[in-house]
Amino acid sequence: MECSNSCLTIDHVIQLDDDKEIRVWETLPKDNTAVRNNTILIASGFARRMDHFAGLAEYLSSNGFHVIRYDSLHHVGLSSGDINEFTMSIGKDSLLIVIEWLKGRGVNKLGLIAASLSARIAYEISNDVDLSFLVTAVGVVNLRDTLERSLKYDYLQLEIEDLPEDLDFEGHNLGSKVFVRDCFKHNWVTLDSTKNKMKNLDIPFIAFTANDDDWVKKAEVLEMMNSISSTKCKLYSLIGSSHDLGENLVVLRNFYQSVTKAAISLDNDSVDLNVEIFEPKFEELTSVTVQERRLKNKIESEILELMN
């Protein structure tokens, strides 16, 4: 565990077999804030590190939440492995490991916030673990369609031996063969597979779509929502946003505000966003972002030293 006096982010390491490790960051609730019932776990989107969600963690902790973030195995970030070996199942296993680790530390009331591709993983596990609530933003529900839209070609139609070695996804080389094999073997691909996992969801759930999202169809998110038997779920739209929630400061602030309101509402067993929030100052958001980048760089330097 590591935290300097000037940095409020606490660094943890989950040690696994084969010398692998998952890095976890913890942000404690700010002093003199409302007491919340649940801890928040944030699952970052594909090609996003946990420090990319520094602002959201600051918003949530400024409104009383204990916040946990992590980097998946075989992904960008501080955990072990290379992104060209990433699969949806590895993402799922990483999330489950962190949830189990939190339970071992006495964190039993947990709300999950997941974005983009990690939302598809959240949909997969939400009925299998003891969550208090779920929030997703620009969550993928039809993996095949999203991949085709983002990559400009339906690579999943090809035979495994005909796939290119790597796929350039958001500037990162995704190992195509290992990823596609896993998609079909473990049934990650279709909208129906997502609906089947979510239809019996019985925890409060809020989903956010973006009205300019070219990667996720709002109609398919709505179809998934309508397949859920519970009435404790609601769909909202992030107006003016694309799939990239950080494309500009206006979109980013709307994302922070909306998700923080959702977390507070769900913490009170409601799916209505008619709550007030405290907003951190821009200078505070900038400061914590810079501090976390420094912490990330320090950890990366230490990892490189150990490898040499």
Swiss-Prot record:
Family membership noted in the UniProt record: Belongs to the LuxD family.
Active site (catalytic residues): S116, D213, H243
Function noted in UniProt: Acyl transferase is part of the fatty acid reductase system required for aldehyde biosynthesis; it produces fatty acids for the luminescent reaction.
UniProt keyword list: Acyltransferase, Luminescence, Transferase
Highest taxon of source: Bacteria
Record pathway: Lipid metabolism; fatty acid reduction for biolumincescence
GO molecular function: acyltransferase activity, transferring groups other than amino-acyl groups
Protein name: Acyl transferase
Coiled-coil intervals, chain numbering: none
Enzyme Commission number, as recorded: 2.3.1.-
Enzyme class: transferase
Gene3D superfamilies (alphabetical): alpha/beta hydrolase
GO biological process, one term: fatty acid metabolic process
Gene: luxD
